[in-house]
């Protein structure tokens, strides 16, 4: 059982890299939306802009769950990622913070453009320290070629990545998918990242 868990987390690490790399580097389309219906291998997803998209998965797909967490779960030494907006003082106001399991350390490490909102950024790195700030806790996150201070406000969504399973993805589930468009207009992906217990991928 322990070995199976380790293998699952290792696969999660490998397959989740697309979550945190620039789209141009992956030649992928990031789909954010809600599962409307499931017809055999076909997932019908309504994107945030109301567009209906059809998605299939590759063989042996990976299901990655997003579980609700809190700032209390973030400790120095953990590897985290955050989508947010840069502020005039050089800090990054976090829209969300996702906590990686140790097996995923290094995934998408760095600071780069993200497509959640205009001018949004993604920062993935190691938590050096957490201090109190005027607007909320401030995480010092160090990556291979720099460091950013992430301001975590009461509105910031904090979640953790955990191994998931197919049965949890049902109509109404909020999902994030990094997919490739197929010649027939459908999309295909090796994994689905989805919200568990009401959580939704905020990135």
Regions found by a protein language model. Give the residues of each.
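Bacterial N-terminal signal peptides that target proteins for export
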Residues: 1-10
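Short, flexible, surface-exposed loop segments at domain boundaries
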Residues: 2, 18-203
């Amino acid at each position: 059982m322990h070995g199976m868990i380790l293998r699952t987390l290792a696969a999660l690490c490998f397959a989740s890299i697309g979550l945190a790399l620039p789209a141009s580097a992956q030649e992928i389309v990031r789909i954010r939306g809600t599962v409307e219906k499931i017809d055999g291998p076909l997932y019908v997803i309504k994107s945030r802009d109301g567009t209906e998209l059809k998605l299939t998965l590759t063989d042996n797909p990976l299901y990655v769950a997003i579980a609700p967490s809190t700032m209390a779960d973030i400790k120095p030494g953990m590897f985290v990622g955050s989508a947010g907006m840069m502020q005039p003082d050089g800090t990054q106001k976090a829209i969300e913070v996702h906590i990686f399991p140790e097996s995923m350390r290094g995934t998408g490490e760095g600071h780069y453009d993200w497509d959640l909102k205009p001018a949004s950024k993604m920062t993935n790195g190691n938590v050096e320290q957490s201090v109190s700030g005027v607007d909320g806790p401030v995480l010092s996150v160090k990556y291979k070629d720099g460091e950013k201070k992430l301001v975590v406000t009461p509105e910031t969504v904090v979640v953790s990545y955990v191994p998931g399973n197919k049965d949890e993805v049902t109509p109404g589930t909020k999902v994030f998918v990094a997919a490739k468009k197929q010649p027939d207009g459908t999309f295909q992906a090796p994994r689905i990242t989805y919200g568990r217990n009401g959580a939704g991928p905020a990135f």
